[in-house]
Amino acid sequence: MGQILLILLLQLIYVPVLTLRTIMLVKGKTVIAGLFGTLETLIYIFALGIVFQDLTTVGMIVYAVGFGLGILLGGFVERKLAIGYNMIQVHTKEYPAELIQQMRDNGYGVTHYQGQGRDGVRYRLDVLAARTRMKELRELVEKHEPKAFLVAFDPIDFKGGYMMKGLRRPK
């Protein structure tokens, strides 16, 4: 019974570490990804060694269930850490002057454009925001432009501009 619980525990550690390693690699943080990869491999070998010592159906099922639960836990950890930034496009029918000002007052850098949509003139705002501030930004948009269309992208790299100063919360 002790080994079964150990297998489950190791999987609940292993998969979130795997998740974090993948995120760090995608975000370009290769040194941190390498450290997570080393830890991930140690846990993997240790857990598999325990399973192979006693090839019971229960051990294999617990290993698989632990992996599935680890994915859920890894996703939860990823959402809580919210590492990185999002580039958000806000599309509106009317020129959103008040929203633009509120965003700037709240420390966001905003670039706005006018374009031609199928049914007439449309406006697009480009806003770079830390993922930890996404909920706050969505609420701000919802308050001022409830019918706005939002699209979020994960930028791989960026440099310069107001962005660097604007990513911090206003004091």
From Swiss-Prot:
Which key words are in the record?
Cell membrane, Membrane, Transmembrane, Transmembrane helix
The keyword Cell inner membrane is assigned to this record: no
Location relative to the cell: Cell membrane
**TM stretches of this protein:** 4-24, 32-52, 57-77
**CC annotations in GO:** plasma membrane
Top-level taxon of origin: Bacteria
> What's one Pfam family here?
DUF5698
- Has keyword Transmembrane helix? yes
Xref: InterPro entries: DUF2179 (IPR019264), DUF5698 (IPR044035), UPF0316 (IPR022930)
Its membrane topology is listed as: Multi-pass membrane protein
Q: Which family does the UniProt entry place this protein in? A: Belongs to the UPF0316 family.
This protein is called UPF0316 protein EAT1b_0871
Give the source species.
Exiguobacterium sp. (strain ATCC BAA-1283 / AT1b)
